[in-house]
Amino acid sequence: MNVNNMELNLQIKSADLYICSASFESRCLAFTEGISKDSINYVAIFYNIDEVNCFDNNLQVLQQQWGKRATSIPVSYKDASNIADVFGAFFKNNFSSQRGKVLLDCTTFTHEGLLIILKYLNEYKSSYDELNIIYNCAEDYSTNTVSVNEKWLTK
């Protein structure tokens, strides 16, 4: 379902937990700009500690937008076992009691990170009532390539 920012508040009235990833792409900010901050109880912001200097302050923007509701969680995507350990600890600590609605913004997670999150969401599915997954499409994945025929990922 395609939903614009004005419709977000109607579609997603509230969530107990919002999981997102800070990145260098401004797309990581799109959802938070369109939702009422009062509708989310707790926010988990994952970020790649190996590339935090490339984020153009997007991590700080997310932290500032969500305030005390947000927790920033560093992950090293260079080490697959670190990804699994960090996400495993997060789910163990945050799904020990029942959650209501979980909202996952998968827009800027790495493939590995997203697969591990989906694994844990499946493992802990009895610990939450509802899961909504949102994604903000990129306009162009091959921004350094001019020729449409050479834009292999955007095709």
Residue map of PLM features:
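Long, low-complexity, Lys/Arg-enriched
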Residues: 1-101, 111-155
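Residue(s) in the substrate-gating loop at a strand-loop-helix junction
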Residues: 104
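Interfaces and regulatory segments of ATP-dependent nucleotide/adenylate/phosphodiester-chemistry enzymes
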Residues: 107
